[in-house]
């Protein structure tokens, strides 16, 4: 029995997608949940797994096609004698011989004595024209070689559906939201020591080390419980600020297709270990094109890690309609003055950008100090 592989809705509001890869051929065997296509939407590039097992008898689309919800992309099951997609013609080899020849142009240049009136200057033949014939009338015949024009080729980059969506979202955010930005330098010395002491335990119990980023996200979540306005969004239709009950922390992930921001759902209920596991899981799914739109929707605040690229400070752009984005920079060892002399401390640059329409710089300052307190005093950051 033949089964139709249809393009189904993989997320809220999705109506179509662009086929970017076809991972199987007609005649191949495929298993249930094995990827058959890669499709790009305006929010994500994701694999489409097969809901059926069997032999692929037809593939009805090609790379570059835009498919709509319900469209039959392939047939799995009984083999058909004639595939639904015509095979691509094989290119023929042609050998062309091109002869290049330089064209010589012979022209006459009439030179008058009046052209050289100063200091008795007379025209002299250069080596390039010394064999030309000079007439008594001062006519000079010069043989010149025409040089081919050099052409500078320009390269173009096609804008993907996802890149276009990113551009539109960033432009919208930058145009609508006036940001206030503050940077804090947080003493993460105790956190560094604590992380080093528990990573062996975490590796043996959870098969993973706990990243600094997981601790930072947990500290931000803790601080949001005291400053919920930074976990809010503005509703222009009702002209009111909506305080979100859940803290869904968006994690900026750098992928080949561009920046993807999946979010950790209900982060306020998770431990440091659970947050660390969620970060790894979402990043892997994003980079292997297995992310779902449900992972991207309903974020309430975003966090980005400048430190992963060695950067300390930057100006992050808020993801509209969120209220805030927090950026963590590269950890640095600094010599600082202490009560009994000097000491080496581990310093975390922490940057907060917030919507200045609804919060002031002083609010951002208090929020930043609370995050710093959570990190410096290791409040609720233990690994159990």
Curated annotation (Swiss-Prot):
<feature type="domain" description="Lipoyl-binding">
    <location>
        <begin position="2"/>
        <end position="77"/>
    </location>
</feature>
<dbReference type="InterPro" id="IPR001078">
    <property type="entry name" value="2-oxoacid_DH_actylTfrase"/>
</dbReference>
<dbReference type="Pfam" id="PF00198">
    <property type="entry name" value="2-oxoacid_dh"/>
</dbReference>
<keyword id="KW-0450">Lipoyl</keyword>
<keyword id="KW-0808">Transferase</keyword>
<dbReference type="InterPro" id="IPR050743">
    <property type="entry name" value="2-oxoacid_DH_E2_comp"/>
</dbReference>
<dbReference type="InterPro" id="IPR023213">
    <property type="entry name" value="CAT-like_dom_sf"/>
</dbReference>
<dbReference type="GO" id="GO:0031405">
    <property type="term" value="F:lipoic acid binding"/>
</dbReference>
<keyword id="KW-0012">Acyltransferase</keyword>
<comment type="similarity">
    <text>Belongs to the 2-oxoacid dehydrogenase family.</text>
</comment>
<dbReference type="InterPro" id="IPR000089">
    <property type="entry name" value="Biotin_lipoyl"/>
</dbReference>
<dbReference type="GO" id="GO:0016407">
    <property type="term" value="F:acetyltransferase activity"/>
</dbReference>
<feature type="modified residue" description="N6-lipoyllysine">
    <location>
        <position position="43"/>
    </location>
</feature>
<comment type="function">
    <text>The pyruvate dehydrogenase complex catalyzes the overall conversion of pyruvate to acetyl-CoA and CO(2). It contains multiple copies of three enzymatic components: pyruvate dehydrogenase (E1), dihydrolipoamide acetyltransferase (E2) and lipoamide dehydrogenase (E3).</text>
</comment>
<dbReference type="GO" id="GO:0005737">
    <property type="term" value="C:cytoplasm"/>
</dbReference>
<feature type="active site">
    <location>
        <position position="356"/>
    </location>
</feature>
<dbReference type="InterPro" id="IPR011053">
    <property type="entry name" value="Single_hybrid_motif"/>
</dbReference>
<dbReference type="GO" id="GO:0004742">
    <property type="term" value="F:dihydrolipoyllysine-residue acetyltransferase activity"/>
</dbReference>
<comment type="subunit">
    <text>Forms a 24-polypeptide structural core with octahedral symmetry.</text>
</comment>
<dbReference type="Pfam" id="PF00364">
    <property type="entry name" value="Biotin_lipoyl"/>
</dbReference>
<protein>
    <recommendedName>
        <fullName>Dihydrolipoyllysine-residue acetyltransferase component of pyruvate dehydrogenase complex</fullName>
        <ecNumber>2.3.1.12</ecNumber>
    </recommendedName>
</protein>
<dbReference type="InterPro" id="IPR003016">
    <property type="entry name" value="2-oxoA_DH_lipoyl-BS"/>
</dbReference>
């Amino acid at each position: 029995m033949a089964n139709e592989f249809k393009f189904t809705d993989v997320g809220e509001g999705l109506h179509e997608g662009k086929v970017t890869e076809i991972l199987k051929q007609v005649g191949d065997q495929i298993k249930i949940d094995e990827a058959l296509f890669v499709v790009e939407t305006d929010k994500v590039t994701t694999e489409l797994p097969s809901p059926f097992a069997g032999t692929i008898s037809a593939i009805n689309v090609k790379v570059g096609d835009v498919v709509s919800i319900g469209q039959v992309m392939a047939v799995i099951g009984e083999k058909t004698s004639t595939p639904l997609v015509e095979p691509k013609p094989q290119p023929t080899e042609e050998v062309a011989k091109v002869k290049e020849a330089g064209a010589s142009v012979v022209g006459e240049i009439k030179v008058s004595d009046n052209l050289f009136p100063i200091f008795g200057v007379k025209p002299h033949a250069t080596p390039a024209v010394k064999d030309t014939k000079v007439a008594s009338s001062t006519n000079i015949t010069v043989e010149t070689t025409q040089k081919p024009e050099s052409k500078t080729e320009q390269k173009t980059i096609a804008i993907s559906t996802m890149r276009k969506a990113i551009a539109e979202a960033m432009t919208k955010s930058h145009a609508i939201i006036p940001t206030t930005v503050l940077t804090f330098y947080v003493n993460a010395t105790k956190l560094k020591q604590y992380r080093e002491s528990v990573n062996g335990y975490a590796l043996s119990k959870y098969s993973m080390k706990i990243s600094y980023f997981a601790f930072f996200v947990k500290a931000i979540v803790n601080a949001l419980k005291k400053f919920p306005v930074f976990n809010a969004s503005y509703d222009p239709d009702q002209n009111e600020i909506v305080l979100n009950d859940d803290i869904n922390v968006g994690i900026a992930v750098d992928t080949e297709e561009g920046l993807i921001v999946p979010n950790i759902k209900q982060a306020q209920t998770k431990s440091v270990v659970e947050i660390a596991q969620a970060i790894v899981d979402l990043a892997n799914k994003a980079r292997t094109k297995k992310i779902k739109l449900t992972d991207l929707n309903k974020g309430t605040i975003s966090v980005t890690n400048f430190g992963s690229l060695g950067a300390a400070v930057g100006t992050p752009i808020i993801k509209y309609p969120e209220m805030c984005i927090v950026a963590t920079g590269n950890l640095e060892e600094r010599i600082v003055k202490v009560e009994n002399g000097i000491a080496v401390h581990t310093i975390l640059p922490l940057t907060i950008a917030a919507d200045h329409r609804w919060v002031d710089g002083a609010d951002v300052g208090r929020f930043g100090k609370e995050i710093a307190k959570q990190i410096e005093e290791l409040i609720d950051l233990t690994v159990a």
